[in-house]
Amino acid sequence: MIKYGTSGFRTHHTTILKIAEKIGLAMVQLVYYKKESFGIMITASHNHHEDNGVKIMDQYGNMVTEDIEHYMEKYVNDEFSNDHMQFQPLVKIFNEDIEIIKKKQLKLYLGYDSRESSPTICELIVKGILKTNDKFPYMVYPLVTTPELHYVFSNSSHSYSQYLKNALEPIQYPCIVDCANGIGSKKMLEFKNPHIRLINTSWTSPQKLNHQCSSDYVCSHHSLPYQSDLFDLKNSLRASLDGDADRVVFYYTENEKLNILNGDYIAALILTYLSKKLTSDKPLMIGYVYTGYTNNACVEYVKSLSFSENITLDTNCAATGVKNLHYEAVKYDIGVYFEQNGHGNVIFRDNIDNLDNLKSLFHPNIGDGILDLFSVLYILQTLDIDHKQWHSFFQPYPSILSKQKVQDKNLFETSRDELTLFEPRDLQDYIDEQCIQSYRAFVRPSGTENVVRLYVEGKEQTKVQEIHKNISTFISKNMNKESFEVKKQTFSIRHIHENDIDDDYYNLLGQLTEINVESMEMQKTKDFIHGLNENHCIYVIECDSTNEIIASGTLLIEQKLIRNYGKVGHIEDIVVDKHWRGYGLGKYMIDHLGKESKKKGCYKCILDCSDSNVGFYEKCSYVRKGAQMSLYF
């Protein structure tokens, strides 16, 4: 099942190609039943160049509401929508009412970026649109950024390029901009400004998209992007857009250290500008909307700002996802929101009339990386401060963000702002015990996979690490297990955790094959366990009364080209401690790995064994199939 997430449908381009025609059919029905126009943007933002995606926007150029997201998700995953005959009644209606639709100027607006698969996906969506009626109105905007399509859709009488040109004109603050070899390169190359220098502008080479560059690369790798040495300007301000130019981050180097000015810093700079420049003769509410991942040092800094008479600041923590921030921001006279990744915007009510210069530097609908870039440079020069002074606004508290595997993410229920767990309550109680004084932590479930994300933040790095380790272990051992009883003994089966790695676990593996425990590097093994993913899972069985790990098994998921990219589960390295044999733990482990393999969508599960173990695996419902061949090196 393909999910419609905060970024729309996004996955490998081959999957998007399969559902593209369905999307066209679904969008026509939305136009007809909602009596509104819609936009369709084909992009995968910061993802690898082989990925692609589709996201929908409403008639105002804003992100669509949840009911439309759920409709799209349900529609593309229902097999019946492949059958054109299902749409015959709708075709007749359209034949009768097509002129009314045109009279109301309803249509679909399609845009796509520079990814190699984008034009084909667009063609298939159009094919789906025209299946309902070959006269249905639509427009295609090739090679546009995501913010550009939002703009032309909601401001069709105005030129986006002219809007950018006007915003760029007053900029005099120097900056080197990494364009991620994405569609933003094409737009940036249209303009000339002696103070802005561009790198990574090869938008006509799709395979270079986001490769060793982009805002996501800089933040996740904490490294300068490729081509950074083209301009040897030490300590100068630099910025990176992402693949579809809807987000930006800033950074500079000093004494060989990379200092990143992310979305927290961008929001703090904008609010500083408002505190110094904005006046009002009537009550005015500014809202700073952020997520739980926003560093508390930034929130504290913003709360310390003083505003002019009649102006009030409200700080509002919203659920993760830019659409959630946007929905909260529009409630204020001025709403400022930015995620740490640099995706954000400033929303102005029409009654704000003394900030025309600043208003023209922000997108009227969504976050725009290019406009946000210009706005930051404009504010720096207007406030007459440099980027080092900007960086000194606050010192972020140490933090750790990690991902934890769980059996069922749906068991985790959070508050609206995602900072508190309603369920499981014992986990929230444990978090509360761990986090005292200036430390905080929260756990939130993923929207798509069976994992939760654990965030811990506080003033001392060592204490943050300790709290993170304790909560992580608690989740692994209590929230991620399946209990069973044999011979009046209770056992639990769960994913392995890095804190399980010790000499006893090595000795357990030594009962399976020869292991030189003295040569094993404990930290290297823990790092290996920490890096496991959903396609490489190690499970352990723990005796609840002694907390000993007494069995282990591995499940590897292989993605194949045959059987329509089918998956195969491989069971490896089954071992039960010699003191605990006779409890059926080996069979329980084998059965559990088989069930997990099925859950992950595998069409079969296979394993290798010696002839002496064939009888055991036959009792586990496995059948002999072929012969194993090996080549050892």
Segments (PLM) and residue ranges:
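Phosphate-binding chemistry for phosphorylated carbohydrates and sugar-nucleotides
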Residues: 6, 10, 14-21, 26, ...
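Catalytic-core signal marking the mid-to-C-terminal active-site face
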Residues: 381-484
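Short amphipathic alpha-helix that is part of the acyltransferase structural core
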Residues: 485-522
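A short helix-loop-beta-strand connector motif used in the catalytic cores of GNAT acetyltransferases and
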Residues: 529-540, 570
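Conserved beta-strand in the GNAT
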Residues: 540, 548-557, 575
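Conserved acetyl-CoA-binding loop-helix of GNAT-fold acetyltransferases
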Residues: 576, 582-595
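Conserved GNAT acetyl-CoA-binding A-motif
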Residues: 597-609
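Conserved beta-strand-loop-alpha-helix junction that forms the acyl-donor binding cleft
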Residues: 606-615, 630-633
